[in-house]
């Protein structure tokens, strides 16, 4: 059995962004040192409710890769409709090389209305982008 930690950086207590990032780092290091299998970072934008503060799971994984040794690094998920698919594929591949093969990839089209206002259009964009990436 594998255990992973879903690190959805939230800010219910109105902490500084620097403090939130430091806490995420500490969680990644703790999980690595205590033999967790993976840590997953999410992508949400615009902080609509005033609490979600994780806008770039690849950057979070890159930071965690530099501070850990064995834990797998996942994105849950990269919102494909916000990214150039070629650039996203290159960024994922670079992170995989930098982390010595520890990357887990999650791709989605967004879940909240502000992330996927036109769900049918977003689904088409997601399908087109995935055909370009072809992971």
Regions found by a protein language model. Give the residues of each.
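N-terminal beta1-alpha1-beta2 module of alpha/beta enzyme domains
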Residues: 1-67, 71, 134
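A sequence-composition feature that detects small, non-aromatic residues
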Residues: 24-28, 38, 64-66, 76, ...
């Amino acid at each position: 059995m594998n255990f992973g930690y879903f690190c959805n950086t939230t800010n219910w207590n109105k902490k500084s962004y620097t403090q939130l990032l430091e806490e995420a780092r500490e969680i990644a290091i703790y999980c690595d040192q205590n033999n967790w299998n993976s840590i997953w970072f999410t992508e949400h934008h615009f902080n609509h409710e005033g609490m979600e503060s994780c806008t770039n799971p690849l950057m979070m994984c890159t930071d965690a890769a530099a501070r850990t040794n064995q834990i797998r690094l996942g994105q849950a998920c990269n919102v494909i409709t916000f990214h150039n698919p070629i650039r996203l594929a290159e960024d994922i591949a670079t992170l995989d090389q930098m982390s010595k093969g520890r990357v887990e990839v999650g791709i989605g089209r967004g879940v909240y209305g502000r992330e996927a206002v036109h769900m049918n259009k977003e689904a088409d964009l997601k399908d087109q982008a995935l055909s370009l990436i072809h992971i």
